[in-house]
From Swiss-Prot:
Species of provenance: Thermotoga maritima (strain ATCC 43589 / DSM 3109 / JCM 10099 / NBRC 100826 / MSB8)
Keywords: Ribonucleoprotein, Ribosomal protein, RNA-binding, rRNA-binding
GO cellular component: cytoplasm; ribonucleoprotein complex; ribosome
SUPFAM superfamilies: Ribosomal protein S6
Protein name as it appears in the record: Small ribosomal subunit protein bS6
GO molecular function: small ribosomal subunit rRNA binding; structural constituent of ribosome
Coiled coil: none
An example Gene Ontology biological process: translation
Amino acid sequence: MAYVKERIYESMFIIAPNVPEEERENLVERVKKIIEERVKGKIDKVERMGMRKFAYEIKKFNEGDYTVIYFRCDGQNLQELENFYRVTPEIIRWQTFRRFDLEKKERKAQREKAAAEATESSEGGSED
């Protein structure tokens, strides 16, 4: 079994509330396309959380449209995503971070599955 340096990331971004709904959808699609094409990642899950109020004012807005994307990649091209966020004025906040907890949970599940398969194959081979 070859070890792949694939890591799990979570990227959350907030779109300004004055952006029309159709443009917000297009922006989410553009982010997904950047993750798949430029970052060379594989998207696991997209959560559209909708409009939420802020605890404090951000760029003169009191609310924004939240989206969270979970994806896998080797991490080498993440700067492409950060650059896109930085130059897109409709995105007023963003944060991307590695999810060590999800990676750990996944590795544990893989080890348990491998152990169960090894147990099954050793039991199946000893029958007369």
